[in-house]
């Protein structure tokens, strides 16, 4: 179908040459480059690009994984990981204030066995996890240790293939 081909070509034009980051050499920039490399961002960028062109909205969730390491060139208790959240598998609930600033973000998913529904909500202050199983919902609230919503949200008004629909 034309829609799929339009998305493939647009993604190829946007991501065929990997993004190049530049900054003055520093330990922080080196660590940043290692995070990008270890998370295989070239592949993720392509997936994000494709999904936003298909669905008009996709999110990238960043989270720490506890693991004593020196992978980024400095001693750390954590590895930074990310996950692409597409409407194909997740329900996304961004919430904005009157100035279009993201003030909270929710993501809902169902386990592969369809036995649990998990809704996670992120604010600058806290991370909420609501788990529903067999009609019973449990709630867990943890402080958001980074003080920011750990999500990069990508949106566009219409899918890239909109003009061939009509």
Residue ranges of predicted features:
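Extended, helix-rich architectural segments
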Residues: 1-79
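Structured, contiguous alpha/beta core segments that scaffold functional sites
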Residues: 52-57, 61-166
């Amino acid at each position: 179908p034309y829609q799929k081909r339009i998305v493939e070509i647009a993604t190829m034009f946007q991501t065929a040459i990997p993004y190049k980051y530049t900054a003055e050499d520093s330990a922080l920039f080196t660590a940043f480059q290692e995070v990008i490399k270890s998370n295989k961002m070239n592949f993720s960028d392509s997936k994000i690009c494709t999904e936003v062109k298909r669905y008009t909205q996709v999110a990238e969730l960043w989270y720490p994984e506890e693991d004593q390491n020196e992978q980024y060139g400095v001693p750390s208790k954590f590895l930074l990981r990310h996950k692409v959240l597409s409407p194909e598998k997740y329900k996304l609930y961004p919430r904005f204030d009157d100035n279009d600033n993201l003030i909270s973000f929710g993501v809902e998913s169902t386990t592969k066995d369809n036995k649990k529904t998990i809704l996670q909500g992120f604010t600058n202050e806290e991370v909420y996890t609501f788990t529903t199983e067999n009609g019973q919902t449990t709630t867990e609230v943890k402080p958001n240790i980074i003080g920011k919503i750990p999500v990069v949200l990508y949106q566009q008004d219409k899918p890239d293939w909109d003009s061939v629909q009509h």
